[in-house]
Amino acid sequence: MSKEEAIEVEGTVIEPLPNAMFKVKLENDHIVLAHISGKMRKYFIKILPGDKVTVELSPYDLTRGRITYRAK
């Protein structure tokens, strides 16, 4: 996402899926499929259903995203 600016939105994890994928419900009630960013995977940050997260969405595909932050 280096060429275009990513869209950052807040959301809540609904359901964990295989391969570090998650269904996330955004603040505007859209549901997106999101994967964990590399740094979160590297440092073993656990994400559970109900966690508040920040998701980066590409302007080209608003149905998929990357989880970049888990709120405490």
Curated annotation (Swiss-Prot):
CC annotations in GO: cytosol
Superkingdom of source: Bacteria
Domain S1-like residue range list: 1-72
Keyword Metal-binding: no
Swiss-Prot/TrEMBL keywords: Cytoplasm, Initiation factor, Protein biosynthesis, RNA-binding, rRNA-binding
Location relative to the cell: Cytoplasm
A Pfam family this chain is assigned to: eIF-1a
GO MF term set: ribosome binding; rRNA binding; translation initiation factor activity
Entry's family note: Belongs to the IF-1 family.
Functional summary from the UniProt entry: One of the essential components for the initiation of protein synthesis. Stabilizes the binding of IF-2 and IF-3 on the 30S subunit to which N-formylmethionyl-tRNA(fMet) subsequently binds. Helps modulate mRNA selection, yielding the 30S pre-initiation complex (PIC). Upon addition of the 50S ribosomal subunit IF-1, IF-2 and IF-3 are released leaving the mature 70S translation initiation complex.
HAMAP family: IF_1
Assembly description: Component of the 30S ribosomal translation pre-initiation complex which assembles on the 30S ribosome in the order IF-2 and IF-3, IF-1 and N-formylmethionyl-tRNA(fMet); mRNA recruitment can occur at any time during PIC assembly.
Protein name, as recorded: Translation initiation factor IF-1
